[in-house]
Amino acid sequence: MNLQKSGFHGFYLPDAGIALDGPLPDGGDAVFISHAHADHAPRNRDAEVYASAATAALIRARGHKGPVNEISFTETVSFPRADVTLYPAGHILGSAMIHIVSDSGSMLYTGDCRTPPSPTSEGFELPDAPVDHLVIEATFGLPIYKWAPHEQLFAQIRDFARNALNDGATPVLLCYNLGKAQEVMHALADAGPEMAVQIHGAGAPLCRVYQSFGINLGRWEPYRKSSLPGKALITPASTADTAMVQNIRNARIAYVSGWASLEARASQLLADALIPLSDHLDFFELLDTCRKCNPGHVYLTHSPNPDVALHFLEQEGFSCSSLDLEMIDDG
């Protein structure tokens, strides 16, 4: 199957006429968006795209103006040169793996995925159909990455926030505004009705989308300095050195990301706690997903160190290679 790079982070399949997370070249039939994170969402805000219902709502909340054709999970849509089906990817709300069947064979593009899935997503489901070519993200494609059970990490989040508040401090949880923030809020909702949260202003419209799809985010409001005392603050790591965070009296900071497992990276944020909750596959989940799909060829994307995972895949008998894509991710 012929794969061509499309934009900074996407692909085009000329034999199928389908673009994935990238612009549509002349002569193409459709653009499919795997999920609403900025490195996968359309840069052309007027472009016509296909996506899951939740991804459609999220990219609209982030300013997409063009038509979005909403596709249900496991629904197959036919185009002149290909049939396309979406499967839930478990990464964030709306995230989809994209299965394409054309005269050149079948391909599963995972986008960003996670199994076990995020409880704030629609789940994780592999197609019950052949996969000749698997294009899978390998953001954490090294054996040093093995995640703790989600519930254990959610309990750490709740304990961190409770303990900070009990000590008269303000718990600040650093994580990406879309996906991770809502998962942290969902975890804190289980701390009880007394747990109140503020979220960075850019995350508020995204929280409303999550709630419209039935996700429980507990008690929350957009960030407001005057009413922050007694509440937890959820804000991106990029704000850690801004006045918003630096001026909080008695702040207690947790970095919530798969990258929190790297203390050297996390120490740059002067965090008091490191909670390695990721919305990606760890190394062992990556290998297991490849085994379950059993493709003729595996393509690794978004990996800073592809050679290690490629070596392990080759040892298991897989034909495999890496694809050069930019990696822009908060873990």
Which residue ranges define each predicted feature?
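Short internal beta-strands
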Residues: 47-57, 135, 195-205, 255, ...
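Binuclear metal-ion centers of metallo-dependent hydrolases, dominated by the metallo-beta-lactamase
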Residues: 6, 128, 142-225, 297-331
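Short, well-ordered alpha-helical microsegments
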Residues: 41, 95, 117-118, 181-185, ...
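Active-site-proximal loop/helix segment associated with metal-binding centers of metalloenzymes
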Residues: 89-102, 113, 117-118, 133-138, ...
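Structural motif
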Residues: 30, 48, 107, 132-134, ...
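Conserved G/P- and acidic residue-centered "switch" motifs that form tight phosphate/ATP-binding loops
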Residues: 35
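C-terminal regulatory/interaction regions
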Residues: 7, 190, 214, 219-331
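His/Asp/Glu-rich metal-coordinating catalytic cores
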Residues: 1-26, 30, 38-174, 179, ...
